[in-house]
Structures are given as structure tokens and as C-alpha cells.
Amino acid sequence: YVTDFPDDELIQKNGVIPIPHLGASTPEAEENCATMAVNQLREFLEHGNLINAVNFADCYLPPTASKRILIANKNIPAIIGNITKILADRKINIANMLNKSKGDYAYNIIDIDNDAEESAITQIRSTKDILMVRII
């Protein structure tokens, strides 16, 4: 028997598994969950960071440059090399980069030192297996 509210008598019995009460249905918990969701959405919109996403790995990189490229792609070999080559060919320096994958998908946060030329972004977007590109 599993319970999150064991009393003294119940907790003494064999087969009882007491677990912590999470309070997920209390008004306080609902408010905290809403606040957490808003903060996570704001973090994605403002910085491109993914926190507690369902279909992507958590991906958090504090901003280290004035420009940021966000890329979602299929998790396959050589795609990162293709992306970085496009940037290198245009002399766009990568200041910091994070790549995380979960199953069939990967997400990249790339901080760059200079502006990304539109032609570079267009070429990245048109690369096979790239799902999304966003500039912040």
C-alpha cells in the first residue's frame, strides 16, 4: 500500500510504502507551477535556453556574446560540422557553443562574436535535417 499521508498506526504495518507528499494539487503548487512555466518560457524566448522540454534535452548556456544562433536538427552524424563550416566560411567566430540531443533530435545554442550574415542563416536553414533556426 502506497500513501503520502501515513499516520502512526499505518506506517508501522508491513507492506506500507510511505512517500513524500508533493502537494501538486494545492493552490500554492498550481501558482508555483505557473510561475515556473512562465520563467522557462521567458528563458527560451529571451535566451533560447530549453528547460524541462518534453521532446528536447535540457539545454542551458549563459549568454557570452552579443548574438546567438539557435538550431534544432535531427540527431545525425556530421550536421554540427556542416553548421560550423558554413559559419567558418564566412569568418563568423563561434564564441561558445552547446549541443544536446535527446533521441532523434538535437538542439544547439551558438554564441557568435559578430553578426551572422543572412546568407549564412539561409544556408543553415536549407541544410538537410535542419528543423529550425532562430537568431537572438
Residue ranges of each PLM-predicted region?
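A conserved regulatory-domain signal marking ACT and ACT-like small-molecule sensing domains
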Residues: 51-136
